[in-house]
Amino acid sequence: MTEKNTNGKLKFDAVFADGIAKSKSTVEYYLLPDEEKEEHHETDAKPLYSYPDSTEYNKQFPEANKYYSKDSNWQSALYSGLTKDKLYKIKAKASKEIDGKLETGKEVTSDSFVIYEVKQFDTFPKIAKYYGVPLKNIMKDNQVMDALVVANNTIFIRNPQTNVPYSPAPLTDQDKMRIDGALMGRGLHCEFGFEPVNLNTGNFYMDQSDVTMNELNGEFSITRSYNSKGTDQHSMFGRGWSFNYDQSLSQMEDGSLLYMRGDGSYLIFDKNEDGSYTAPDGYVYDLKAVSYKDTDHDYIGWELTDADQSIWSFDKYGILRYVTDVNGFKTVLDYDDDYNLSKITTPSGKTFGVKQDKFGHIKELSLPDGGKVTYKYDEQGNLISVTDPNGTTKEYQYDDDSRMTSWKDENGNTVVKNTYDKEGRVVEQTDAEKGTATFKYGKNSTTTTDNEGNKTVYHYDDQYRTTSIEYPDGTTCEKTYNAENQLASETTAAGTKSYTYDAFGNVATETREDGKTASYTYNDQNKLTSVTGYNGATVTYSYDGNGNMVTSTKPDGTAITYTYDDKHRMVSQTDGRGVTTTYSYDGPNMTGYVDGNGAAWGFTYDAMNRAVTMTDPLGNVTSNSYDANGNLTS
């Protein structure tokens, strides 16, 4: 249960478990590790699905989220006051007297979880990466209303992979150009903090998604990114903005290619004597020229393959036309005769219509369900408002140099205010809770002071890679890099943690402070094939020719197997006991599954691939409804 609001507040209050057991059985449960050796708790399983029921708990935590769908027939008591950074899980088993004999079911274990207190310089993507969990899971579990994370928030992390708390030669002008370009967006080896600011460069950077939906190749989104140091760039969303499908290639005088990325950054690929191209150090890309036929002529275009084996196809003008993932699922971009983007078609055939004004700015985005997102610009080409399908509007304000000075959310609340120096760096920032942070820039260092007076110093080299951090409590963290521009080591008071990599940039080994090493291997698609932990135990993975995982084998030899259909959707999963669950689909949406006991579940979806009904094995139907923005309303 989490308290939240549109100003970025997220406060974890408590957690409870619920599940399905035989009607009128007694469910015994306890929290690990706190109650492992103490008296366990009991509750009765109801005849009907009555849980989760947050009514009673909302009296204790009135601002916490509420649950409406009823998916289970028992529920635990509330666990609150949990210790941060401690790994928890809940165990339960049911028993029932049948014909005078007590029958007890198998003990089951919930997902593990930790409670994390957000630090001053965190962002949700960094938190997700550190804990090794999908970002969307964190956002969903905590029902995040604003993607800006606020220091001292407490959040729920499900199934974390850890519960451990968190002088070269002068550069030429061309070197500086390469570095400046790569530092836009989420600059490699840079620190980000506050709302957020690149603490190595002073660039204010943020991204906002106007639409997200489930697709055959995962989550499809249209996401805008803003860079305060990129205001000389004019994109489809105005000055300083970019979006994930606004990508292009252009050629430089020396034959090298400049790749403009969707987050506003750019990379320069050197052209070799044999005509091939080399990516900058630290980036896993393969860029090659290809020939293709357009009407009656052959043309040269380019294909860019990333670390996930997705292929980004550019035409003769260097304009992005297709994105094809490792399984062959293709996202298509169509343009009119004037090369205005007219529509984006997802792998399952969903179409997003695009209208642009005479300046090439996107003014309207039409959605598959008939909804629309509209955009307005000022005379300088700055994006000043975005109105969502619900009719609510975000607003953006800029200074005379088109640097964003503030923006307001859909409720009219000012989320952030920025003040810049003459070099375009953020020197003062006020957040939604009126907390003000300051930034002082020195030679190869930045000193930040938060609203409580805590000072942190960030040091970086001439490539703006973080080399050390001095924290308010006097502790430090030092970082080194190898010749391929990859993080080689991190040294703190606890010791040094070091990393090695394979030829494709994948982490091959991690050696922690006590000298123990974990190792990783990969196949030719950069898919993880084995993990040998610090304790020497190895988990292995195998894949079919399309890159779908077909087995995962634990150290004891127990294997889980998976099968897929011709669209690479998982249609069965068999666990180590031989119990099989089967799945059925309509396009990207799972329409049903049957578990190992023969219990069947069914689902239906709307035009935006959102679940609208769920039918449980007892025939009970739960319905969901959404507003025009896709927010669950009932």
Task: Write out the residue ranges for each language-model feature.
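Primarily a LysM-type cell-wall glycan-binding module
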Residues: 111-134
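Short, compositionally biased P/S/T/A/G/V-rich stretches that sit at domain boundaries
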Residues: 1-7
